[in-house]
Amino acid sequence: MLKLYIRPVCLLRPEEEVASLSLLVESRREKVRTIKGKENRSRSIAAGLLLRYMLLEEQIPYAEESFGLEEHGKPRLKKDGVFFNLSHAGAYVAGVLSDVPVGVDVE
């Protein structure tokens, strides 16, 4: 399995940012809160929403307990045999879901 997703990113109004954050797991919300700059926050939120969509489409729970951290702090799924990677830059966010370790770079 290899599924690639690419979506445009739009700047969020404050009320849209609040609503979007409520759909993300707490670890992603915490990450977003540390980001300075509206554009960078919007990209990070878009990446989190894309991951949520990717997992739910595959019927994988999007919940805090579904995630762990790799050795160097990179988020990973606890579910065996499912790997993801996200990238965001400029006006796009990209995500990939696979049954083998995988990476994606939107640039």
Which residue ranges define each predicted feature?
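Core catalytic alpha/beta fold that binds nucleotide/phospho-ligands
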Residues: 1-107
